[in-house]
Curated annotation (Swiss-Prot):
Sequence intervals crossing the membrane: 356-376, 471-491, 496-516
Keywords: Lipid biosynthesis, Lipid metabolism, Membrane, NADP, Oxidoreductase, Transmembrane, Transmembrane helix
Membrane topology value: Multi-pass membrane protein
Annotated PANTHER family: FATTY ACYL-COA REDUCTASE CG8306-RELATED (PTHR11011:SF45), MALE STERILITY PROTEIN 2-RELATED (PTHR11011)
Listed InterPro entries: FAR, FAR_C, Far_NAD-bd, NAD(P)-bd_dom_sf
Any one GO molecular function term: alcohol-forming long-chain fatty acyl-CoA reductase activity
Family affiliation: Belongs to the fatty acyl-CoA reductase family.
Function in brief: Catalyzes the reduction of C16 or C18 fatty acyl-CoA to fatty alcohols.
Coiled-coil regions listed in the entry: none
GO biological process, one term: long-chain fatty-acyl-CoA metabolic process
Protein name as annotated: Putative fatty acyl-CoA reductase CG8306
Amino acid sequence: MASSPITDFYAGRNVFITGATGFVGVTIVEKLLRDVPNVGTLYLLMRAKKGKSVQERLEELKKNSVFDKFKELQLQSRLSKIVPIEGDVGLEHLGISPKDRQTLIDNVNVVFHSAATLDFFQSLKETTNINLRGTRRVVELCQQIKNLDALVHVSSAYVNAYLTKVEEKLYPAPEDPEKIIQLSETLNDDALKELEPKLLKDHPNTYTFTKHLAEHEVANVASKFPCGIVRPSMITAAWKEPIPGWTISKNGPQGFFMGASKGVLRRLPLDPSIIMDYIPIDVVVNGIITTGYYVNSLQAKNGGRPADLQIFHLTSSTYKPFRFELMTDKINSYLHDYPLNSAVWYPNLRLVKSLWVFRLSAILFHFIPAIILDLVTKIGGGRPILVRLHKNVWNSLNTLEKFIFTEWHFDSKRLLALSKTLNIVDKKKFFIDIGELAWDEYFSNTILGVRQYLSKEPIKNLEKARRKDKILLGLHVALQLSFWYGVFKLIVCLTGISTAKAALVLPVLYYLFGLL
């Protein structure tokens, strides 16, 4: 049987992972434990949170749905390889105690840095501290590690969002990192906010700006030890592993599928004709793990000297492009294949190309129903949240507009070339080539995954939910008929025209209303 060079590389090696409790980090942990039986210790940077110690949070992490298959595969014992390291990338020296730091220095061989703040609305002071300085702190630790074989930094395809065609290379820093750090230390948030337009230049927000600068922190040490940067685009549910459709992230399509399946999200500001760059989480994780192996192998080929910094795009836009126009009708079909028992209305998602048309339609289809449902919820003793939810979406649209209506083309030739260097075993086990991905099947699985892992509805209540879906359809049709009958009577009453003429006006109104 052919061997797996990637598995062989990680066998016996100890790995330090930041951001380990996040979507990417926890999936890295699962993949290494499942497919690299002899991997060494996995040190996870974790912080005490909400009154829970890191040990308590680790026990919670082990119960994450990403590990659901471990019981079936009898792999629970491998979870003992996980060791929590209390710390925080936002603190000096990563907030790690001297004893734990020495443990990492003495034992770690590979570092995966995936910790970051993903909030597009966070202040420059905070994003600088976590994304830029946090990366610098990780790099400083890496320089102290005695036997470091690879550092892989998880960046983002959107760090160069001011370009619509992006290559797998390092672009010039938009500003001097030292200057940004100094300003963030000396100025308050309000003063920094005033300087933001001048500092960010063409960057749409503080996230892409500070993540771009963070890449240069890694580039500065690429001559000292093997380094790689991976740039995922919008990370979505699992394609194949650990379970097709698995997700714990509400970002991107998972979030709006969740709202649509509830029946509360009915319009979405999105141009179905533009390419949306989505990449499954399992492909991202395989890309990270493969990069760690690859940058180390280059050093061996280079006479023990680190090769140039390696940058790879984990993206789909130029290789397996996806547009919603390919499956607009299918999305609603999938929502009814896997309906929610907790749905409050019949799901019917429509995409709206124009932001101002979306705002108008949101008043009719989001806010008015939300006010009614929140009132009913409040009367019933529940906590009304729908109006607040839709307000948050409304207020964020101006900031998100660039990401909603811009088509990017992220070149991924280097990643595909990397895939071709792998042997047949690693191509299958650590797949990074999405050439065989079928988007329609993928999104069907994603909607089922959203149902199971985000909405927390088990498969066993699916038939019950489908019966409810049919009832909601009947109510939906009845409400529409009642509404248009009321409009018809109102036209006759207000204008005094005959019912025959009113019947001619009604289709025109129906058509115009349908544009919203």
